[in-house]
Amino acid sequence: RFGKKVYSPVIDKGEADYILSFEKLEAERWIEYLKVGGKIITNTQEVDPMPVITGAAEYPADIVKKLEEAGAKVDAKDFLSIAEEAGSSKAVNIVLMGRLSEYFDDIPYEDWSTAIDAIVPEKFRELNHKAFDLGRQA
């Protein structure tokens, strides 16, 4: 949620227009919050949860296909590699934000750039702007 006045950062199930996730299983966990026709922007990275690490379970197959079958519009890419291309794997969040910005035609690029400048320490701004731009181009 964003805007001049946010009354609560929590949304009800079935109301999210977008879900951004750092890995596919995370997207699957939160899909019930997505509205019909909503979009999921997810990194294709797989992070094994503890049951997979211990051998008690296998990482679920075909997550992107399952998300699409559930009615989500899925934009799945290797955003981690894009962040590394920008200069740091830690920038994957900004890469995802850059990708998200492509779906908001009514928010000018300059506003996104100003927001980055407002929250990112100066020594990391160049990296974050590069990550954001690469995300937009993904």
Give the location of each predicted region.
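Active-site cofactor/cluster-binding pocket
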Residues: 1-138
